[in-house]
Design a protein with these regions (language model features):
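Thiol-/selenol-based redox modules, centered on thioredoxin-like
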Residues: 97-129
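Conserved redox-active cysteine motifs that mediate thiol-disulfide chemistry
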Residues: 17-34
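Stable alpha-helical elements in mature extracytoplasmic
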Residues: 28-31, 57, 117, 124
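Structural microenvironment flanking redox-active thiols in thiol-disulfide oxidoreductases
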Residues: 31-68, 81-87
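Short pre-active-site segment immediately N-terminal to redox-active cysteine/selenocysteine motifs
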Residues: 11-13, 18-21, 53
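Loop/turn elements at helix/coil->beta-strand transitions in domains of secreted/extracellular proteins
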Residues: 8-13, 42-45, 70-73, 105
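A short beta-strand-turn-helix
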Residues: 1-13, 36
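Short, internal strand/loop/helix patches
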Residues: 64-97, 105
Length: 129
């Protein structure tokens, strides 16, 4: 997980923590897909970090990604040491999802709740870029 947050370059990173079993997470996934398409070819990476259980990777996560034709980069976090990596994401995060972090070399924004719409996400990204 740490390498995702240690990038110091001219790229903007949009990192969303989600799971297939989290209804609010699934509801906001189209916003990240839209952002991924909108900024294709630009210096932006959209990374969807799944917190799905390891036992569900093949039966639920892989199938979900394929059925929903997710184009954003999907990573799986299997580290069960939650207290350690939650603090690395943001000290104010209690561990509930969905959560999004948008950062560049100069700025960082933590969104500790479900996004209302695509425009909210794009507004945060515009402020960070």
């Amino acid at each position: 997980l740490a390498p995702i947050f240690e990038k110091q370059n001219d790229t903007t990173y949009v990192i969303n923590f989600w799971a297939t079993w989290c209804k609010p997470c699934v509801e906001e996934l189209p916003y990240f897909e839209q952002l991924h398409e909108r900024f294709a070819g630009e210096k932006m990476r959209v990374i969807l970090v799944s917190l799905d259980f390891e036992r569900d990777l093949e039966t639920k996560l892989t199938q979900f990604v394929e059925q929903n034709q997710l184009k954003s980069e999907v990573k799986v976090l299997l580290d069960g040491n939650y207290n350690e990596w939650i603090d690395k994401v943001d000290p104010d995060w209690g561990g509930a999802i969905p959560v999004t972090v948008v950062y560049s070399a100069a700025k960082r924004q933590f969104i500790g709740q479900q996004l209302a719409n695509y425009e909210e996400l794009e507004s945060v990204v515009a402020a960070i870029r």
